[in-house]
């Protein structure tokens, strides 16, 4: 996506937000509403299933990853996306762009 497209998505996610906490909540909402779950990706060379998205107490956005009976939260800014990425992954890219 282009810088302009990412900026437009960021603007859409944060349009009614007054501070960084509300902006993070806006991105969380857009990711939850648009990202097609579950999907499989590779984290540290291991295939995991991304099952859900959560907002941490520090307002970072987390992906709930599972393999077998083990679950681990991974910050979406650190989450490798598969090729092709799932529908709605542009919101993760916009969040990464917004964070700088």
Model-derived features: positions:
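Mixed-charge, Lys/Arg-rich low-complexity intrinsically disordered regions
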Residues: 1-38
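Preference for intrinsically disordered or flexible, low-complexity segments
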Residues: 1-2, 6, 82-85, 98-100
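Long, low-complexity intrinsically disordered regions
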Residues: 13-16, 89-100
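A short beta-strand micro-motif
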Residues: 39-43
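Short beta-strand-centered aromatic/proline hotspots
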Residues: 46-54
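Short aromatic-glycine-enriched beta-strand elements
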Residues: 57-64
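A short macromolecule-binding patch
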Residues: 70-79
């Amino acid at each position: 996506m282009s810088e302009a497209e990412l900026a437009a998505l960021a603007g859409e996610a944060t349009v009614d937000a007054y501070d960084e906490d509300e902006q993070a909540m806006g991105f969380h909402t857009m990711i939850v509403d648009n990202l097609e779950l579950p999907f499989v990706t590779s984290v540290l060379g291991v295939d995991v299933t991304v099952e859900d998205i959560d907002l941490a107490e520090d307002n970072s956005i987390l992906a709930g990853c599972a393999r077998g009976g083990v679950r681990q939260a991974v910050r979406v800014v650190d989450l490798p996306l598969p090729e092709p990425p799932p529908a709605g992954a542009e919101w993760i890219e916009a969040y990464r762009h917004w964070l700088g």
